[in-house]
Every structure is written in C-alpha cells, then in structure tokens.
Amino acid sequence: MLSFVKKSIALVAALQAVTALATPISSEAGVEKRGSGFANAVYFTNWGIYGRNFQPADLPASEITHVLYSFMNVRADGTIFSGDTYADYEKHYAGDSWNDVGTNAYGCVKQLYLLKKQNRNMKVMLSIGGWTWSTNFPAAASSAATRKTFAQSAVGFMKDWGFDGIDIDWEYPADATQAQNMVLLLQAVRSELDSYAAQYAKGHHFLLSIAAPAGPDNYNKLKFAELGKVLDYINLMAYDYAGSWSNYTGHDANIYANPQNPNATPYNTDDAVQAYINGGVPANKIVLGMPIYGRSFQQTEGIGKPYNGIGSGSWENGIWDYKALPKAGATVKCDDTAKGCYSYDPSTKELISFDTPAMISTKVSWLKGKGLGGTMFWEASASKKGSDSLISTSHQGLGSQDSTQNYLDYPNSKYDNIKKGMN
C-alpha cells in the first residue's frame, strides 16, 4: 500500500502529466500543433487481409486515434513503393463497383478513407519500412538528393491515398552517421509535409512519427534531442525483450527489471523511457508500444529458466496471437516486480509471455504518471473483442484521447474518388 508521501508524489506526477498533455505540442522544427489528448494508436498490416482475414472495417475505429498502415517499401534512391498493390488499392470490397468512371482507389486505401469519414477523430498514417524492409534506409537517407526523393515520394503517397501523416520504421540506424542521416531524412519529410499543407491543405498539420527501439544497443545511437524536435510521436517498441534469441525464458514487455530474477528481465521499458527523456525527448511525445501477441518457450520450468525450443505459433513459430491466449490448461501468472505476465502449463512445460487486460491497465496508469503521450499496439489483427480487448482496455484507461480531426480534402490526389471525398 502506498504511504501518504507516495500518494502525494503520485498525485503530483499525475497532475504534471495532465498539464503536459493539455498543451499543444510545439517546436522550432516545424511541429506546430498536435492533438492534446492521449494517442491510442494501432498498426494495421496490409497482409492481414489474407489468411488472418482482418479487414479495415474490423478495426475498433471509435477507440483508435491513429492507424499506422504498414508497410511501404523503400528503394536505395529514396523512392517509396507499394509492396502489395492488390491489398493497398486494387482489391474490390463489397459495394465497390467495377464500372466506376476515372482512376479510382479501392482496397484498404478506400476502406480506410471511408472509416475516416465515419470516425473523424481517427487519423491514418503511412508507415514505411519495418523489420523486413529497412535494408535500404541507410542509402535512402545518405544524401540530400535521396532524402528529397524520399520525402516527395512519401508525401505523394500520403496525398494520393488520403492519409494524415507519415510513420517511419527504420530498424535500426547502425552508427552515428546513420542516426544523423535519420534526423536529416525526417527533417526533409517534415519540410515536404509543411510545403504540401501550405499549398493544398490550408496549412493543416500533417503528422510525422517513428517506431523507436527500446533496446539500449539501438537507442543509444539515436539523436534524441533532434528527434524530439522534428517528430510528433515517438512510438516506442517496448516489446520483444525475450524470444528465440534469449538464453532463458523472459518477459516480452515488462516495465521494470526484477533484481530477484534478472534472467527474466534482460531489458525493461522504464530504462528505455528514461533514456529518451534524459536525452531530450519531451515525455509527451513518447508513445508506449505494447504487443497484441505472446512469445512462447518450450520445455521450461518457469520464467527466467532455461528452455528448449519455441514451438509453433499462430502464423510463425514462437509467436501466438493474443486472441489465442491463454491456451487451455495454462495458468496466467504475473510478476508484480517486473510488471509482466505469462501463462504456464506444467503438463506441457510451455510458457508464453504476453500482456493481459489488467497489465494494460497497469501500463496505462504508469505512462500517465510518466507524462507520456499514449499507447501504440502491434498489431490489430491479433486482438480480441469486447472486455478482453487490449485496445479497448487502453481506450478506457486513457480517458481523454486526442480528438483532433482527420483530414479529408485532397484536391490533387491522383485518384478521382479520393479527390471527390468518396461522394
């Protein structure tokens, strides 16, 4: 139980967090305004429409502030391109005509635009890169010419598709030169966004974010203060702390280290967040990323113990969709020191680390106390519905979410139906 002093400290921290989030974000680097409420963002993957059968209409749009549509690929010369044109803008959904006049967007692009019209507080951002498609970022960011190409290409897709901003998922800058080039790349994109807005969108503030590492080997290379100036959001990938690469079973997304069981907590979120803040990132630009999946370990006696293999998964070995958890016969346990949960089945000796709704509530309370900017989830197709939904739990816990409206007017989109607002 908290003492009176600790309660007072907690109250002060909460008031500071509310005060910080009540003020629009500003900086000298072009970020003039961003929503004052909390973000509740979620990644939507275009490959999810296939085997997972998760379509844009399945998103809990009324609970989400930002959809991060992933992923676009990038060439070494800086050009952005679609890795799946069918999913992005060719697939015809129910109600889509094959006889429309002109050049029109279909697929996820049209479906997301329609969702934007129905849910004016839900913004959609174009996410570029990802783990698989980060190979060409170093080259694309290496010169002023390639950075300009990247910025123009990215903003071109944004306006053609009727999106609200750009999210860059570069995993990861490998050294100081790449880290500085990342800043220059982001500055080029920010400049291009503002230039487009001035000419075609009445100065509207389009958003710019990144997916950011939570491991010190990667985040210690970043230019924290400069990132804090140019970005609206830094979406911290505070997960994948343990997995097939680990020597012991461990928590996937724990807040703290556990000194009594260090093997279970090789990384932790609190250290990462503090590093970003100490480096000069405003706390309310940091968004806490959380997994909608679990990582499994086989033939183990428990958390922080040796294991043998990771087993199968929902779509790839060792990774289970949250909606498949906990498995029958497994008991959910939580480490109250580390703030991490897992399921364990003593008969099969399988351990799966994942976040429960109660842990999401704990994390939301924690991030509010830190004055952070909200939550992000990877990724939408793995979620449950109803009271067990992690996205819904976050939505309810955050309370005052970002209510800035999305943008619908794209007069120079190359797609006639987006140009006309789907009217």
From Swiss-Prot:
EC number: 3.2.1.14
Highest taxon, organism lineage: Eukaryota
First and last residue of the signal peptide: 1-22
Enzyme class: hydrolase
Annotated chitin binding sites: G102, T103, G129, G130, W131, T132, Y172, M237, A238, Y239, D240, W378
Keyword Hydrolase included in the entry's annotation: yes
Predominant subcellular localization, coarse grouping: secreted
Active site per database record: E171
GO biological process terms on file: chitin catabolic process; polysaccharide catabolic process
UniProt keyword annotation of Hydrolase present: yes
GO MF annotation: an example: chitin binding
Keywords in alphabetical order: Carbohydrate metabolism, Chitin degradation, Cleavage on pair of basic residues, Glycosidase, Hydrolase, Polysaccharide degradation, Secreted, Signal, Zymogen
Reactions this protein catalyses: Random endo-hydrolysis of N-acetyl-beta-D-glucosaminide (1->4)-beta-linkages in chitin and chitodextrins
Family recorded in the similarity comment: Belongs to the glycosyl hydrolase 18 family. Chitinase class V subfamily.
Protein name: Chitinase 1
Biological source species: Aphanocladium album (Wheat rust fungus)
Organismal lineage: Eukaryota, Fungi, Dikarya, Ascomycota, Pezizomycotina
Gene behind the chain: CHI1
